[in-house]
Amino acid sequence: QRHRTAKWGGTYDPSKKDKKALLNKVLEYAPKKPLEGALQMILVFYMPRPKSHYRSGKYSHLLKDSSPTNHIKTPDSDNLGKLVMDALDKKFYKNDSQICQLQIEKLYCDIGERPSTEVHIEHI
């Protein structure tokens, strides 16, 4: 999310806590020095499945045949991507303007998987 204006006239970043939480989880993978040059970033977001994707009764642990693989609801891909790019800025690369190629996928988790995010960054 973008910065918001409060009733008292100041601005705040509603996603600041999310960015900090993400950075804390991935900091151990950060390079010793931020990457330089043109970069490619691939992001894969595994989203939780709603109960409506599952069968009922004794087969409630199985997915319906009609269950989609791709997540087409909010949050939007561009907002998720911006959150990750902003969170990793200055630690993984000098500036997110270095990201020349960006691929974002939003998929539903498979049975037994937890929601997660994969981040791949490489030089191009």
Where are these regions (language model features)?
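Acidic, proline/glycine-enriched N-terminal capping motif
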Residues: Q1-I124
